[in-house]
Amino acid sequence: MISTPEPLHAGHILTPFCCGVDSIDNWLEQRAMKNQTTGASRTFVCCGSDSNVLAYYSLASSAVTTNTSPGRFRRNMPDPIPVVVLGRLAVDKSLHGQGVARALVRDAGLRVIQVAETIGIRGMLVHALSDEAREFYQRVGFVPSPMDPMMLMVTLGDLVESV
């Protein structure tokens, strides 16, 4: 059984999390709690019954220039465009192929929609680390940047429609 996403705290066990990508595994262990404490990003984790992290994602605020954004994303927007960055998203190898990543994107989308009721946000942005990740994000509604196909975005309106 896996828990619903909750904010990372000191009681969570970060090792032996292994998604198969060293940089993402290492970020969870070495940076996630520091960023949580300083406010640089917020990490949300799903755990097993023993508080071991089995999946996670992080969110941070940012902005993108209009020339790096797809047409619908930049239409009628200031430069730069306010966004939330889906900074990391990973699922332990033991849960690959079970829809957990898609559920994490949905949860992140719901949080972004909630935040957008308080502050101005155009949508969510992600930097895919591989072609496989890029294809996944495109399947869940993200559109690639015209300047960088590994940077993908989804508008707030599309998030609302998809969740």
Swiss-Prot record:
CDD domains: NAT_SF
Signal peptide: none
Gene3D superfamilies, per the entry: 3.40.630.30
Active-site residues annotated for this sequence: 137
The reaction(s) this protein catalyses: glycyl-tRNA(Gly) + acetyl-CoA = N-acetylglycyl-tRNA(Gly) + CoA + H(+)
EC id: 2.3.1.-
Description of what induces expression: The tacA2-tacT2 operon is up-regulated about 15-fold in a relA-spoT-dependent manner within 30 minutes of phagocytosis by mouse bone marrow-derived macrophages.
Taxonomic superkingdom: Bacteria
GO molecular function: acyltransferase activity, transferring groups other than amino-acyl groups; tRNA binding
Top EC category: transferase
The entry's keywords: Acyltransferase, Repressor, RNA-binding, Toxin-antitoxin system, Transcription, Transcription regulation, Transferase, tRNA-binding
UniProt note: phenotype after gene disruption: Deleting the operon causes 90% reduction in persister cell formation in mouse bone marrow-derived macrophages. All 3 tacA-tacT operons can be deleted without an effect on growth in cell culture.
UniProt pH dependence: Optimum pH is 7.5, has much less activity at pH 6.0-7.0.
Pfam families: Acetyltransf_7
Residues reported in the UniProt entry to bind acetyl-CoA: 89, 91, 96-99, 101-102, 132, 139
InterPro entries, per the entry: Acyl_CoA_acyltransferase (IPR016181), GNAT_dom (IPR000182)
Family: Belongs to the acetyltransferase family. GNAT subfamily.
Quaternary structure and partners: Homodimer (in absence of antitoxin). Forms a complex with cognate antitoxin TacA2. Forms a 4:2 antitoxin:toxin complex with cognate antitoxin TacA2.
Role: Toxic component of a type II toxin-antitoxin (TA) system. Acetylates tRNA and inhibits translation. Acetylates exclusively Gly in situ. Overexpression during the lag phase of a tacA2-tacT2 deletion strain leads to very small increase in persister cells in the presence of cefotaxime but no detectable growth phenotype in absence of antibiotics. Compared to a protein with a single amino acid change (TacT2 from S.enterica NCTC 13349, Glu-29 is Lys in NCTC 13349) this protein binds tRNA very poorly and acetylates tRNA very poorly. Persister cell formation is neutralized by cognate antitoxin TacA2. The TacA2-TacT2 complex both represses and derepresses expression of its own operon.
Protein name: tRNA-acetylating toxin 2
Gene for this chain: tacT2
